[in-house]
């Protein structure tokens, strides 16, 4: 999760480890890379990275949990150099859209558009939800060849009321994330 606010203490109250990566792509990439490096330095296998977070959506109503199976950058715009929207220049080995196998069949699948802005207007790139960390986390996992799963709780409509809606939906999101985590733990046991 990006912020302790998103977790509402529900994971910690059960003694579960959580990495809060901070807001935005740079903070997310740094925090996860550092955590994975700690695993490597300790001689441990890389974990299945499970990202829970909130997202805005103009396609799905607030209160919907979605599994993001694909990730794009909604704010990478170098079209002036002839590079497609969402593509990082000179990153030829990285696909425009990062995809991962689904883990939660009970959830609808979604494409997550990540950018370093709190979205309040329509996106220029095709995506179902918008967030500020998903693509960065997905790219780190793709590069490190470790499993990645991301579930987003639609907290707002990515519109003019997004800020207030986001805050009012945090507790519901945290409880749903815990349910999904516990279901995954049971499944893996």
Q: Model-found features: residue ranges?
A:
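Structural motif
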Residues: 1-5
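Glycine-rich phosphate- or other oxyanion-binding loops that anchor nucleotides, phosphorylated ligands
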Residues: 6-188
């Amino acid at each position: 999760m990006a912020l302790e606010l998103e977790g509402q203490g529900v994971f910690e109250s059960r003694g579960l480890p959580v990495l809060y990566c901070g807001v935005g792509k740079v903070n997310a990439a740094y925090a996860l890379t550092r955590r994975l490096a700690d695993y490597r330095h300790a001689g441990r296998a890389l974990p299945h990275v499970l990202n829970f977070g909130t997202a805005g959506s103009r396609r799905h109503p607030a209160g919907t949990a979605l599994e993001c199976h694909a990730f794009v950058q909604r704010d990478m715009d170098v079209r002036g150099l002839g590079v497609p929207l969402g593509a990082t220049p000179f990153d030829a080995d990285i696909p425009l859209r990062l995809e991962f196998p689904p883990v939660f069949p009970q959830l609808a699948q979604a494409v997550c558009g990540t950018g370093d802005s709190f979205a309040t207007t329509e996106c220029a790139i095709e995506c179902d939800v918008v967030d500020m960390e998903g693509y960065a986390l997905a790219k780190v996992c793709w590069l490190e060849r470790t499993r990645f799963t991301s579930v987003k709780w639609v907290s707002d409509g990515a519109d003019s009321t997004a800020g207030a809606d986001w805050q009012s939906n945090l507790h519901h999101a945290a409880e749903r994330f815990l349910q999904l985590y516990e279901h995954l733990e049971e499944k893996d046991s």
